[in-house]
Curated annotation (Swiss-Prot):
The protein's name: Zona pellucida sperm-binding protein 2
Keyword Lipid metabolism: no
Species the sequence originates in: Homo sapiens (Human)
Lineage: Eukaryota, Metazoa, Chordata, Craniata, Vertebrata
Localization per Swiss-Prot or TrEMBL: Cell membrane
GO CC annotation, single: egg coat
Record's comment on post-translational modification: Proteolytically cleaved before the transmembrane segment to yield the secreted ectodomain incorporated in the zona pellucida. Proteolytically cleaved in the N-terminal part by the metalloendopeptidase ASTL exocytosed from cortical granules after fertilization, yielding a N-terminal peptide of about 30 kDa which remains covalently attached to the C-terminal peptide via disulfide bond(s). This cleavage may play an important role in the post-fertilization block to polyspermy. Additional proteolytically cleavage of the N-terminal peptide of 30 kDa occurs in one-cell and two-cell embryos.
Signal peptide start-end: 1-38
């Protein structure tokens, strides 16, 4: 006979005390091989019933044996006296040879269950003549019918236990005087993995069965055979399918149960209580607490948020919880009296009842010791791993103020506080011969009072330090003359000069990519910027930028690119400055420009070797510019800027990480001739008109932006050559004159 039990909750006492329960369905199969009481009304005999009776949760099913004479009999439900029951509705199926009747109107309530009487009569005989009556007993199927027992599973630390009603007095193994040996067998697991054990075998593997007058209690350890373990992170769930079979003379009882157990405690913070369950085949159907049954679709409207990614997390607003005073806690404790979670599982409904409690609301730790410094501070360090999940160090504050740490290293998970004894909410008190100073470091929640889910770890740490009374600090005001105004000067700055592939300025060239190769008239994009500064009131201003043939920025010859913060106005292709957009945090910390690659010449020779670039710059105060270069407007008289510019000590010089190799388009110095060496003249104009383009060149300059002696020398050579030509011409004319004079004579 198959019996299904459903029940409420039961809190066992004594060794059964536990804080977690799993509510699950139980199926009890009870096959009656013989009835307990068979009566022939006419003959008063008790023949054994040859069929099978099955007790379900709602009805009784009687199965008659198949024999050649079965079509000649008739069966009906009657009362114990053999009289018809007019309110009883039953179904007699001659084809299947079954009779089905409900408990409500077709049975009589007896102690521990239901009693039903049927009458079987041969159709060929006279009415009631030769009729046989059989009485059957079915145990109470509902848990509430069995003296208040509960079908809930209790979760202990290492095992789960559940109770079943004791439906017959002979179920216990205490009938040693009987000739027939009764026994239990246990089937653990589901499907092909199911394993059947005798009771002694199960006891050896850690199972246990306890039977008293009203109930049977079965213990299943978490590591037993057939128990499925689901784990995800730090959360665990155990699930098991069981069949307990008891065989006794004339009857066979099978209890079938499926149980789930989640033994992990809940976690709590300032706003919510969180229950975590790992991923398993069950699907949440409803949540019940405080006489409320809430469907999963209505959880959010009732202050519960469901997070169904990677398992399941239920976040209960603390406004739903109760509070109580506990001997274990200094402050009040949040809890729920009971919480039932109902799941759809294979394909039955399985419920789990738990009793969640938050841990005590007390400070995480109290730090004492030699923390007080001689200058009146407390120094303390806080690490992110002091809570689980890790602490968000950016939310830490001291006392009732906004005092923040003096040092923070997120990569190391460390912050350091330097707490003044006379500030940041520090309190003091006298204890014996000591003065004790106390403060609290805590994390703040932006959503308190609760308005959203907060998964931040709660952190409160009390820090204390003390002085001896004899060493107590004294505050003394010493009047003195007003000190002179300090001379303010900016501290050291670090600049960097880099080159970029294009004007997007996304990624600079690395040091291992130098020397860079550039062809004539190809732009070279450069950037100067300030490193490791977050001050929005400073501004980077270029002074000069120039090129040299060696890595020494002071070497000669030099070729100017930027002079006094402006493009060099003697170039054929002038330097172009690029604005710095909002893509960077502090645009005033950058200067960007590009120059066109030219053939660099010195002393009438074109240099095709490596060229090094350098820049000098200074840092200006945007709020109070202290140098004319801080507010340059181009073009401006170079002489005027030089006269009022910054001193050399205020400037900083930076260089590119490596040189640039300047080549012509065909990797030779095509188009570069003597005409290119002349600063002006018809030959230069003729060259440009014949070729239709300008082949740029730069003459070497001194540091003031003027032509160097090498270029002046080339002009002198040209002048001497011209003078020699004139002398030769005059000599040739004189020669012709003398020759004509001789011939005339």
């Amino acid at each position: 006979m198959a019996c299904r039990q459903r029940g409420g909750s039961w809190s066992p006492s004594g060794w059964f005390n536990a804080g977690w329960s799993t509510y699950r369905s139980i199926s009890l199969f009870f096959a009656l091989v013989t009835s307990g009481n068979s009566i022939d009304v006419s003959q008063l005999v008790n023949p054994a019933f040859p069929g099978t009776v099955t007790c379900d949760e709602r009805e009784i099913t009687v199965e008659f044996p198949s024999s050649p004479g079965t079509k000649k009999w008739h069966a009906s439900v009657v009362d114990p006296l053999g009289l018809d029951m007019p309110n009883c509705t039953y179904i007699l199926d001659p084809e299947k040879l079954t009779l089905r009747a409900t408990y409500d109107n077709c049975t009589r309530r007896v102690h521990g269950g239901h009693q039903m009487t049927i009458r079987v009569m041969n159709n060929s005989a006279a009415l009631r003549h030769g009729a046989v009556m059989y009485q059957f007993f079915c145990p109470a199927m509902q848990v509430e019918e069995t003296q208040g027992l509960s079908a809930s599973t209790i979760c202990q630390k290492d095992f789960m236990s559940f109770s079943l009603p004791r439906v017959f007095s002979g179920l216990a193994d205490d009938s040693k005087g009987t000739k027939v040996q009764m026994g239990w067998s246990i089937e653990v697991g589901d499907g092909a993995r199911a394993k059947t054990l005798t009771l002694p075998e199960a006891m050896k593997e850690g199972f246990s069965l306890l039977i008293d007058n009203h109930r049977m209690t079965f213990h299943v350890p978490f590591n037993a055979t057939g128990v499925t373990h689901y784990v995800q992170g730090n959360s665990h769930l155990y699930m098991v399918s069981l069949k307990l079979t008891f065989i006794s003379p004339g009857q066979k009882v099978i209890f079938s149960s499926q149980a789930i157990c989640a033994p992990d405690p809940v976690t709590c913070n300032a706003t919510h209580m969180t229950l975590t369950i790992p991923e398993f085949p069950g699907k949440l159907k409803s949540v019940s607490f405080e006489n409320q049954n809430i469907d999963v679709s209505q959880l959010h409207d009732n202050g519960i948020d469901l997070e169904a990614t990677n398992g399941m997390k239920l976040h209960f607003s603390k406004t739903l919880l109760k509070t109580k005073l506990s001997e274990k806690c200094l402050l009040h404790q949040f809890y729920l009296a009971s919480l039932k979670l109902t799941f759809l599982l294979r394909p039955e409904t399985v419920s789990m009842v738990i009793y969640p409690e938050c841990l005590c609301e007390s400070p995480v730790s109290i730090v004492t010791g030699e923390l007080c410094t001689q200058d009146g501070f407390m120094d303390v360090e806080v690490y992110s791993y002091q809570t689980q999940p890790a602490l968000d160090l950016g939310t830490l504050r001291v006392g009732n103020s906004s005092c923040q740490p003096v040092f923070e290293a997120q990569s190391q998970g460390l912050v350091r506080f330097h707490i003044p004894l006379n500030g940041c909410g520090t309190r003091y008190k006298f204890e014996d011969d000591k003065v004790v100073y106390e403060n609290e470091i805590h994390a703040l929640w932006t959503d308190f009072p609760p308005s959203k889910i907060s998964r931040d770890s709660e952190f409160r740490m009390t820090v204390k330090c003390s002085y001896s009374r004899n060493d107590m600090l004294l505050n003394i005001n010493v009047e003195s003359l007003t000190p002179p105004v300090a001379s303010v000067k900016l501290g050291p700055f670090t600049l960097i000069l880099q080159s970029y592939p294009d004007n997007s300025y996304q990624q600079p060239y690395g040091e291992n990519e130098y020397p860079l190769v550039r062809f004539l008239r190809q732009p070279i994009y450069m950037e100067v910027r300030v490193l490791n500064r977050d001050d929005p009131n400073i501004k980077l201003v270029l002074d000069d930028c120039w090129a040299t043939s060696t890595m020494d920025p002071d070497s000669f010859p030099q070729w100017n690119v930027v002079v006094d913060g402006c493009a060099y106005d003697l170039d054929n292709y002038q330097t172009t400055f690029h604005p710095v957009g909002s893509s960077v945090t502090h645009p005033d910390h950058y200067q960007r420009f590009d120059m066109k690659a030219f053939a660099f010449v010195s002393e009438a020779h074109v240099l095709s070797s490596l060229v090094y670039f350098h820049c000098s710059a200074l840092i200006c105060n945007r709020l109070s510019p202290d140098s004319p270069l801080c507010s340059v407007t181009c073009p401006v008289s170079s002489r005027h800027r030089r006269a009022t510019g910054a001193t050399e000590a205020e400037k900083m010089t930076v260089s590119l990480p490596g040189p640039i190799l300047l080549l012509s388009d065909d990797s030779s110095f095509r188009g570069v001739g003597s005409s290119d060496l002349k600063a002006s003249g018809s030959s230069g104009e003729k060259s440009r008109s014949e070729t239709g383009e300008e082949v740029g060149s730069r003459g070497a300059m001194d540091t003031k932006g003027h032509k160097t002696a090498g270029d002046v020398g080339s002009k002198a050579v040209a002048a001497v050559a011209a003078f020699a030509g004139v002398v030769a011409t005059l000599g040739f004319i004189y020669y012709l004159y003398e020759k004509r004079t001789v011939s005339n004579h």
